[in-house]
Amino acid sequence: MMDTYFTITVYSNNPDRAGKAITEAFNKIKKIESELSVYDDESELARLNRKKVLKAPSQDLKKNIERALYYSNLTDGAFDITVHPILDLYGRTFMEKGIPPAGETIKRELKKVDYKRVLVKEDLIRIGDDQLITLGGIAKGYAVEEAVKILRSHNITMALIDAGGNMRAMGIKPEGVWNIAMEDPRDMNNYITIVPLDNNAV
């Protein structure tokens, strides 16, 4: 899901309740993926990128774009969901030639990157005619937090959600905090430190 894996670990003395909570959480994650994935041609986000305007968007899509624009304003554009043409350019060039794209090509694509051209209204989202957006920098975290809400609604208090290495802990395990090993980037068979999680994320 979302071009990565999700695992949910739950501690509960009620297996049926835990099973229902996990199933509902995964269903919500799948629903979010069907709306926000840039890899699914039938997703709402893909339709927005094709048509440049989307009427009656889902709340998940609207919330994520609004949140992304908030962070774009906060960072003065350092975080920008309209960066997709640049990501696509680098991906294609490395795939075809094994080298970074040429400077002039990058400059041309950079003209499409401007979060201020994204318009969000109550029942409509519009992007520039030459723009493409990606929610890869925000959607996975949103999906995790939505899964946390569902687990809590089932009175689950001890859980760990692993979203492709992004870890979100709910409370602690019966034996204590969740100990998360941070992989050594130079040696995948080793780790560089252990991070204890207690109702937080890394």
Regions found by a protein language model. Give the residues of each.
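Mature catalytic core of soluble alpha/beta enzymes
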Residues: 1-202
